[in-house]
Amino acid sequence: MRHMRPLIALSLAGLMTLSACGEDVAAKDDSAAGSSAAGGSNNSAPAKDGGSITVRGCTPQNPLIPSNTNETCGGNVLDAVTARLIHYNPDTAKPEMDIAQSIETKDNQNFTVKIKPGYKFSDGTKVKAQNFVAGWNWAAYGPNAQQSGYFFEPIEGYADEQCGDEACKTKPKVKTMSGLKVVDDHTFTIKTTEKVSNLKVRLGYTAFAPLPDAFLKDPTNKKWEKMPIGAGPYKVTDNTATAITVAKNENYAGAYQGHVDKVTFKIYNDASPAYNDTVANNLDINDLVPTDQLTNDQWKSDLSGRWAIRQSGINQTLTYSGKDKQLASNKDLVKALGMDLSLIHI
């Protein structure tokens, strides 16, 4: 019988998310108790280094480019593949220095960033200040139509990089933001249009990951969409319609080294097949419990001794389609529906 163990090798935000309950559910080693209460500690046994595991994945909605991935399916993969200036502690969510050696400011508008020497991308090239500055300029450039391009809006000159119209028939004034300057290989500066007190915290978002020289020289090459080059603890080795596999990045120089050698994100676009595979021990880690298994905590019985719960911050919204003419033209009806919905039952 294959043992289930916690995926502590990857920094996957919301790794074990219990749908609609605001809690995290994680598979645990069989030797550990599987009944920790919500908000309780995770008492799973220590995972051993090496080997491989399978994790529930889903089809990325966009290419695996840091600034173009803003959903969980692709985000979980890029969390393993990329390193950023800031790393979020998986237990406390507090920002910690990763590639950044220091981020200093006296006025929350002018920032000096120094990066640690020795970091490399998975292709063996060095991570330099230019990889951040050029990468951010490319990501913010309107014609590149990046899903997360708006993350760079606080930086001076962002507006000048945007298209003059929705169809982008009027090209931007510039291709680089005036608020970004390379000082040397390990130093660059950021100037924002106004004071931004939490900029340091934001710099851990995937969109701010540095882009390698190979990408910057040929950004339209389709291979980057499925086989990204990052500076994180893992690298993508295979990407198909049914699975995305990442293996340890031998060039990784950071403090967040992975424990397992290989992780395969098996693609499931429905919660039930993934759940059934988990129960049958054909899937090691699953972060989603089907709603029909939540009744009477059926999933706890099915996965006895192999689960854990922890608190998680989840933002959920309920909206209606703008194409629904009846709702779009009747604000009172929308309000009535909202008042009728009981949050207790959602």
Regions found by a protein language model. Give the residues of each.
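Extracellular/periplasmic solute-recognition and catalytic clefts
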Residues: 237-247, 264-328, 336
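Alpha-helical secondary-structure segments
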Residues: 128-137, 185-191, 232-233, 260-262, ...
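Bacterial lipoprotein signal-peptidase II cleavage site
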Residues: 21-35
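Gly/Pro-rich hinge or "lid" segments in bacterial periplasmic/extracellular proteins
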Residues: 186, 192-257, 262
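Surface-exposed binding/hinge segments that line
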Residues: 104, 140, 144-213
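Secretory targeting and sorting signals
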Residues: 1-25
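N-terminal lobe/hinge region of extracytoplasmic solute-binding protein
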Residues: 56-107, 229
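Aromatic- and charge-enriched surface segment that lines or borders ligand/interaction sites
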Residues: 101-151, 189, 280, 327
